[in-house]
Amino acid sequence: MLPIRDCVQQTPGYVPGEQPQTTDYIKLNTNENPYAPPDEIFNNLEEELKKVRLYPDPVSTKLRKAAGEVFGFSYEQILAGNGSDDILNIALRTFVNPGETVAFLDLTYSLYETIAKVHGATIQTISTNENFELDSPLICPEAKLIFVASPNPPLGKHLNRQYLKETCEQATGVVLIDEAYVDFSDEDHWDFIKEYDNVIVSRTMSKSYSLAGMRVGFGISSREIIEQMNKVRDSYNLDRIAQTLGANCFQFQDYFQSIWQKVRTTRNRLIASLRNLDFFVFDSDANFVLASPQWIEASDLYTKLKERKVLVRYFKHPRISNYIRITVGTDAEIDRLLEVIKQLKNES
């Protein structure tokens, strides 16, 4: 019998969204950016490809400096990761001994629970109200690490800012604020890093910078925290192509800001259109919306959309079992989605 750790055997594992191997689907299920990065980011790639026999910069210096210029922090306060998921794992290894407590909301990014269980941590979930929002700060005195996403998936709304501030003030451990979707909103938490010595903000280039296939993320915090996290980072955790493309993307802020605004405009149109089609839809600060059809079971709608080559995300979580999550695509993709939904509604 294989000597598999108990915590691994008891963990079902993270279930990612479908990644079809054909191109005939409208893919609105994994919150990727519908717009490609500018062609110019590939200009110096050939030079890097010639160096693939060599290890990349182990600490991603150029990438961190480029990120620091955009984020407004010294590169010494930034840790680069293989996607922001890497940052979450590094934080666990840095701050939480097996058996110690990790806290997060009862409805949030499901990877938090998976990686905490695999780490052997004790899990404390914090309840949200009937609207999946906080009624109070996240108070968990025994938690060595609190994961909190804002905007928070799968709802897509920012958490109450004052409650987050009080969470950071009262926490005895580290608070990691996951800002994977923040560029599609008007709010960030950079000031929390300057105000509190126990805060990490994580960012990803998968959503807003159109680099989901490259896996580039960051942890931003005090120099002291980043120094400790760097000790447990995997060696060479970003390949040279990811480092190069990530750094290049930061040179095109005007372009990316324009597509963030495009996504926000399309998102608002999608919300209004779904409401007109008899959906209950939450407002969103992200590049997706959470919607509940009032005329069909969400699981059935998910299946019928998939049969018509439109992929959305359905979760079996009991609190959102009659919701689907829809990534904001291009206007043409959203038009097709709405067209199919109208057809299905007329047939129901």
From Swiss-Prot:
The keyword Amino-acid biosynthesis applies. Keywords: Amino-acid biosynthesis, Aminotransferase, Histidine biosynthesis, Pyridoxal phosphate, Transferase. Its EC number is 2.6.1.9. Pathway: Amino-acid biosynthesis; L-histidine biosynthesis; L-histidine from 5-phospho-alpha-D-ribose 1-diphosphate: step 7/9. Gene3D superfamilies: Aspartate Aminotransferase, domain 1, Type I PLP-dependent aspartate aminotransferase-like (Major domain). Belongs to the class-II pyridoxal-phosphate-dependent aminotransferase family. Histidinol-phosphate aminotransferase subfamily. This is Histidinol-phosphate aminotransferase. The lineage of its organism: Bacteria, Bacillati, Cyanobacteriota, Cyanophyceae, Oscillatoriophycideae.
